[in-house]
């Protein structure tokens, strides 16, 4: 798909896609922190605060045909056009500094012009041009999973919520936009969640169901090396509703309920949402769902997200697991599954591998959730690159795993995401699976969840005896983040942190 330079110039996300490609392929972004001898970047130390915001406002108006291109933007674009015949590698050479400098300016201008996209209220829209710009941007994002009108198979331009505060990669030089070039499709919908965009706290209720898992819940599939998991414990919907009511009596509103990986059958989820949708204050549901094999095809393992948007309408989105779990000899013995699965073989989870997709779910201006399923937290490809690029404020990993201890693998990967890009991370497993994990010499542990954020650090979360759910009160802190070339974001980066834990039971 070819686009004219004029078409690229008129839409900031397109400009950002172009500058990102040039800076990444040439490695010239490093010159922003190590300019050639005798050069400085930016040329005017006050450019970020004194000039850039006004230029970005005018570029937004230009993008929707309500103003002409501002002189500073036009001058940089003309310089870039003059360098069209140059090889990309030449951008790092001192004699091409003027062209490289123009690309760096255009990169920052396009980034600043897209401030606030991707969250419910975003940047205050005080002019008709800003309203037009936001409507067009959200249309592209919701329909095509990209802010650019460039073929997403080539590149996607996405909103960005965190800027890495360590290291120096291309991601370190933008606050509001990022690019990805991968097979992963993006679903980013601004769904009316019922939460005020400026809400300071939300209450998330965790159900570590099933509470018991037996070896017979794991079965081989025919003569193959696949296994199927299906819990024998049925979901008591009435009891879940009573637990939610008990939670409300203790903390007030319950904004969201979460179930671990593969914890619910399709029928369980249907019965649960059917019961809850009758409520005016139906909580948002994020659940790990399993679907059995059918018609000669393998089953499915996915996360489903459900929001009540009106009295008659629900929004529902699915995200399928991207990697199969492999149960080897060590894990079969760790979870004491030898009576169901032969430890002399490797057993692979019997699920279809669907098209790779990531969901980003903005609940408030401060909390945008990205759900992951078990191995997807640990495997670097194909989704980890996209998660790091966007920097969602809260990653929720649904697991079918052992106890959530600081020494185990979920903690390691949560720490990586908390450091770069700066996301807060919640992991949740079932009590049944946590108690099945009994390595030699270790006592069973009721650690069903783990939380990691930059403000309060790492916390193991235990489900006490006689309790069936845990309510987490999540607050948010606004921080100023800086690009590697010292451009601040005005304190628009949010860090969700844990401010309260309330175990819930029906004593």
Locate each region found by the language model.
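A short C-terminal boundary segment appended to hydrolase-like catalytic domains
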Residues: 469-507
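Active-site catalytic loop in hydrolytic enzyme cores
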Residues: 175-198, 298-389
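Cys-nucleophile CN-hydrolase/nitrilase-fold catalytic domain and related Cys-dependent amidase chemistry
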Residues: 234-321, 410-415, 419
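CN hydrolase (nitrilase-like) catalytic-core segments centered on the catalytic cysteine
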Residues: 2-108, 255, 269-287, 374-483
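Short, flexible loop segments at the rims of nucleotide/cofactor-binding pockets, characterized by
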Residues: 232-236, 261-263, 347-350, 371-376, ...
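Long, charge-dense tracts
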Residues: 31-212, 260
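Cofactor-binding loop segments of dinucleotide-utilizing enzymes, especially the Rossmann-like FAD-
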Residues: 209, 308, 430
């Amino acid at each position: 798909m070819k686009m004219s330079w004029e078409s690229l110039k008129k839409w900031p996300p397109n400009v950002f896609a172009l500058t990102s490609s040039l800076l990444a392929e040439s490695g010239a972004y490093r010159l922003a922190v190590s300019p050639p001898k005798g050069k400085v970047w930016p040329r005017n130390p006050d450019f970020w605060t004194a000039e850039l915001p006004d230029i970005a406002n005018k570029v937004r108006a230009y993008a929707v045909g309500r103003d002409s291109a501002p002189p500073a933007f036009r001058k940089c674009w003309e310089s870039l056009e003059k360098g069209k015949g140059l090889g990309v590698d030449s951008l790092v050479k001192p004699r091409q500094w003027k062209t490289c400098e123009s690309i760096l300016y255009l990169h920052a201008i396009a980034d600043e012009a897209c401030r606030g996209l991707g969250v419910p209220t975003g940047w205050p829209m005080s002019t008709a041009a800003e309203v037009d710009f936001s409507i067009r941007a959200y249309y592209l994002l919701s329909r095509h999973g990209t802010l650019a009108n460039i073929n997403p198979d080539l590149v996607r331009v996405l909103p960005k919520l965190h800027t890495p505060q360590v290291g120096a990669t291309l991601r370190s030089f933008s606050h509001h936009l990022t690019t990805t070039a991968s097979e992963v499709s993006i679903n980013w919908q601004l769904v009316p969640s019922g939460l005020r965009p400026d809400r300071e706290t939300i209450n998330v209720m965790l159900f570590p169901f099933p509470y018991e898992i037996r070896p017979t819940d794991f079965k081989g599939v025919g003569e193959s090396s696949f296994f199927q998991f299906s819990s024998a414990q049925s979901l008591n919907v009435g009891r879940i509703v009573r637990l939610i009511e008990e939670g409300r009596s203790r903390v007030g509103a319950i904004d969201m309920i979460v179930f671990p990986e593969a914890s619910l059958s399709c029928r369980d989820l249907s019965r649960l949402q059917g019961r809850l949708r009758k409520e005016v204050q139906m909580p948002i549901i994020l659940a790990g769902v399993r679907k059995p094999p059918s018609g000669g095809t393998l089953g499915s393992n996915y996360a489903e997200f459900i929001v009540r948007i009106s009295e008659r309408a629900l929004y529902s989105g699915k995200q399928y697991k991207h990697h199969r779990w492999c149960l080897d000899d060590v894990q079969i013995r760790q979870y004491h599954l030898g009576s169901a699965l032969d430890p002399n073989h490797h057993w692979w989870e019997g699920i279809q591998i669907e098209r790779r997709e990531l969901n980003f779910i903005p609940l408030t201006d401060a909390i945008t959730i990205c759900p992951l399923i078990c191995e997807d937290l640990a495997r670097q490809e194909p989704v980890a690159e996209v998660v790091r690029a966007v920097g969602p404020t809260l990653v929720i990993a649904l697991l079918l795993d052992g106890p959530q201890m600081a020494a185990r693998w979920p903690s390691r990967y949560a720490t990586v995401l908390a450091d770069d890009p700066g996301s807060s991370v919640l992991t949740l497993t079932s009590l049944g699976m946590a108690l099945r994990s009994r390595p030699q010499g270790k006592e069973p542990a009721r650690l069903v969840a783990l939380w990691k954020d930059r403000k309060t650090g790492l916390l193991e979360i235990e489900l006490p005896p006689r309790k069936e759910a845990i309510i987490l009160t999540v607050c948010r802190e606004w921080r100023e983040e800086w690009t590697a070339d010292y451009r601040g974001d005005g304190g628009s980066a949010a860090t969700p942190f844990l401010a309260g834990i309330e175990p819930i039971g029906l004593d």
